[in-house]
Every structure is written in C-alpha cells, then in structure tokens.
C-alpha cells in the first residue's frame, strides 16, 4: 500500500511506529522526481554550456570569470529563502497549516523586496566586477554583460527556488520538477535564437535559413533570464490556483510576524552566511585560476559543469531529506528524523559513488560535449578524474546538510562548511596552484570534499543537530 508524506506525518503525530518500508517508500517518492529533475536540468545545462563553448574558449572564460560571483549572490539569497521552506515543512509536520500559509505569504513579500534590491546591486556592480576578479581585458565586456543580465532576473530566480521548495515540503516533488525541466527547455530554445546569428541549416535534407540575433554571451544570459521569469511565474501560479495546504486563496494573514522574522534570522542567517563563505571562497579560487591562463579558466569552468553529472543526484535527495526531516521534527518525532536522515544520506552516498565511476571513465567525452578545444578537453578530463574519488563523501555532506537544515541546525552546517572550505580547500589551493597549476587546485578540492563529508557524518552520528527542536 502506497503512503503519502501527508499520511505519514499524521501517523507520526499520533506516535505510531512507522515501518521502515513506508519511510523508504516516501523517501523514494520524494527523491526520484527530484533526482530526475536534476538529471534533466543538468543535461540542459550541458547543452547550454556547449552552445556557449562552441563560440570559443574566450566566451566560456567570460562566463567562468563571473560564475563564482553568481554563486555568491544567489547562494546568499537562496540561504535566506530556504529558511521559509524549512518553516513550512515543520509547520506542516505539526499540522499548523494556517501558520504555514502565513510563512508562504511573508516569503512572497520578502522575495519581492530583497529580489529587487539584489538585482539593483548586481546590475550596479557588473561594470567593475570582472576587473576586480582579475579578468583579462578582452574578457571584461562579455563578463560584465552576462552578470548584469543575470542579476536583473534575480527576483524570478528567487521566486522559482522558494516556491518549488515549498511545494516539495508538502510532499509534491513532481510539480516543481516539471517546472524546472520546462524552464530549462525554454532556456535552450531562447539561447538557440539569441546566441547564434542568422544562418543556413540543413534539416531533413532541406536547406533552411534560421533567424538569430547573434548576441553571443549576452544572448546566453538573456535566454536564461527569460526562462527563469517564466519558471518563477509558473511556480507562483501553482500556489495561487491549485488547492492544497499552501493554497494562497485559503484564509491567512499577510502581516509580517515576529515569529517568522525570528525563525528567518535563526535559520536563514547562518544559511546565508554559509553560502557566502562557500561562494566567496569560490571567488578567491577563481582569482587563483584566472592567473593560470585562458585554457585553465575554460577547463575549470567546464569541468565544474561536467562534475554536476555526479552531484545532481545528491542535491535531488537533499531536497527530499530537508522536507522529510522537517516534517518529522515538526511532528516531534526525533526517531523518525534520524531514520530519514540516515536513509537519505546512504542513498546519496551510494548513487554518487556510482556516478563517480562514470565521471572517471567518461571524463574526456564529457569535456568534449562542451568544447572542441583539445587543450581544454585534456586538462578538464585530468582534473575530473581527480575529483571522481571524492564523490561519495561529497554526497554524504550534501544530504546530511539537508537533513540538519530540515531540523533547523543551520549554524552547525555553516561552521562545518566554513572550516572545511577555508581551512582545507583554500589553504591547499594557494600552496599547490603555483607548482601544479589547475591540477593542484582540483587536488585541493578533492581533499576538502572528503574532509567535509567526514565532518558531516560525525556530527550526524553524534545527534546534536536534533537539539534545535521545532520552530516557534
């Protein structure tokens, strides 16, 4: 007999001993759509990167220069937004549906205000950013344009991320997955016409003139921005029109409450700080890589895209772990929270171990998807094979952190990530890059990910992450 997350939460609140097969079924029900979403989204990102990569290594390097800055800004905003979805999961687990809808409404106001402010900041700094990062003069114009256009779409990016996470908190992983896939398909379509100029193509033996704007890197940014605008609007439309515990049409207040603000500060501030710490370290790493030449910059950027083949499953399971643990904590069932955490973490490690093998075996072919530059392919394949050994422990850190965040332990996650990234990866990269180049940077990354996974497993085993309890 199948069981939904809502039914499982009701049984947890009643104190029932839920069989392991039911918890595993719910975990798989939430994980599989999220994993499939990550697979499709990653495939679309591969196509997206390949469309830019075939313009040339300089185009790829232009985006690679500012990619860590997009991670920094987006990561901080995503951390704050995640605090709202964690509250929703715990309130639904406690059967406090009106409180959950109140949090949703407050998140909408937050997204609008903070998203517009962040967009203005990003556009305002885009002119100077590539220079601050040490980019070659020839790369700066395209890098600035890409960052400015991407920043302008931040309100929609925040909306899609926040509302999709809230839908998953209700046990619906399919709808946000479909929205994400549709958004990625739109991204490819928009990029096809915006990146390339008008050209002749042969389709089924017929010569056709295909229209295009030929905007190159700025066209890639605009295509992504337009797709995100559609995705964010669709996610909001689902919450407006579809019946369910989070339906905005149901009774609820639009007032900002002290409890919600307290919880956002308690959970969201450490999450934002964590993302800032990780992403700012990435900015410094890009600064290190930018001094290694255009080939290294392109190989590093495309290598990161190729590696996402491995960790996409981990992040899919992390989404499920956050919702499951959040509802278990809300239902005051520490035993179920632990079960979900270990079950999901084991799934993440196992799947990422398998994809790590694939990454090692097919590294040259993966790099060949993105670029035809032989030097970039050779260097990228070499560093990917180093990274493949870290994938199981990377999976442990991804899913375990999602479990802890679902319980409200964002401070613990922040400290572990800070120590690992700044104490291990950056230190080793500074020491190894001058002698070993990009290979040294990725050796540092591999060592750090293994360390991070061990730290998260140790904290999860000690159980102190559950002491945070349910939110106010």
Question: Model segments located where?
Answer:
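Short alpha-helical transmembrane segments in multi-pass integral membrane proteins
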Residues: 1-34, 88-155, 186, 202-269, ...
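N-terminal transmembrane alpha-helices
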Residues: 18-50, 54-55, 68-87, 112-119, ...
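Transmembrane helical elements of multi-pass membrane transporters/channels
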Residues: 29-48, 149, 160, 227-231, ...
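Residue-level hotspots within the lipid-embedded alpha helices of multi-pass solute transporters
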Residues: 38-39, 75, 115, 119, ...
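Helix-terminus/linker motif at the lipid-water interface of multi-pass membrane proteins
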Residues: 39-61, 130-137, 193-198, 207, ...
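Alpha-helical transmembrane segments of multipass membrane proteins
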Residues: 46-50, 128, 162-166, 188-193, ...
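Interfacial/gating helices of multi-pass transporter permease domains
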Residues: 51-71, 137-145, 217-222, 259-267, ...
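Small-residue-rich hydrophobic transmembrane alpha-helices
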Residues: 60-120, 157-176, 286, 299-363, ...
């Amino acid at each position: 007999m199948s069981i939904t997350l809502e039914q499982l939460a009701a049984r947890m609140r009643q104190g029932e001993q839920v069989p392991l097969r039911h918890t595993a079924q719910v975990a798989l029900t939430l994980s599989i759509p999220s994993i499939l979403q990550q697979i499709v989204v990653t495939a679309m990102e591969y196509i997206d990167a390949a469309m830019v990569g075939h313009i040339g290594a300089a185009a790829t390097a232009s985006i690679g220069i500012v990619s860590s800055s997009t991670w920094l800004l987006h990561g901080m905003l995503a951390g704050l937004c995640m605090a709202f979805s964690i509250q929703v999961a715990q309130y639904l687990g406690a059967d406090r549906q009106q409180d959950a809808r109140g949090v949703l409404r407050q998140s909408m106001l937050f997204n609008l205000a903070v998203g517009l402010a962040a967009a203005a900041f990003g556009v305002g700094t885009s002119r100077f950013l590539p220079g601050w990062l040490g980019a070659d003069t020839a790369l700066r114009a395209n890098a600035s344009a890409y960052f400015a256009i991407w920043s302008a779409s931040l309100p929609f990016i925040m909306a899609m991320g926040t509302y999709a996470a809230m839908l998953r908190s209700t046990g619906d992983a399919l709808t946000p997955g479909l929205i994400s896939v549709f958004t990625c398909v739109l991204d490819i379509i928009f990029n096809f016409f915006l990146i390339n100029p008008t050209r002749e193509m042969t389709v089924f033996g017929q010569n056709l003139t295909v229209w295009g704007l030929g905007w190159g890197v700025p066209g890639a940014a605009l295509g992504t921005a337009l797709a995100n605008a559609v995705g964010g609007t669709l996610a909001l439309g689902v919450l407006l029109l579809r019946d369910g515990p989070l339906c905005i049409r149901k009774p609820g207040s639009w007032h900002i409450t002290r409890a919600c603000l307290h919880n956002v500060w308690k959970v969201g501030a450490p999450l934002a700080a964590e993302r800032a710490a990780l992403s700012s370290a990435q900015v410094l790493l890009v600064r290190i890589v930018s001094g290694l030449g255009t080939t290294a910059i392109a190989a590093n950027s495309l290598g990161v895209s190729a590696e996402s083949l491995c960790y996409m499953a981990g992040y899919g399971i992390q989404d499920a772990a956050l919702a499951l643990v959040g509802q278990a904590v809300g239902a005051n069932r520490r035993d179920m929270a632990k079960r979900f955490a270990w079950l999901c973490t084991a799934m993440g490690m196992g799947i990422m171990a398998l994809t790590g093998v694939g990454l090692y075996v097919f590294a040259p072919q993966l790099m060949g998807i993105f670029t035809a530059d032989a030097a970039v392919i050779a260097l990228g394949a070499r560093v990917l094979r180093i990274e493949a050994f870290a994938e199981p422990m990377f999976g442990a850190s991804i899913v375990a952190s999602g479990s802890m965040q679902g319980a409200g332990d964002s401070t613990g996650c922040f400290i572990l990530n800070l120590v690992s990234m700044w104490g291990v990866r950056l230190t080793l990269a500074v020491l190894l890059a001058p002698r070993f180049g990009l290979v040294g940077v990725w050796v540092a990354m591999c060592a750090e990910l293994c360390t991070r996974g061990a730290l998260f497993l140790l904290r999860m085993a000690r159980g102190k992450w559950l002491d945070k309890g349910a939110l106010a």
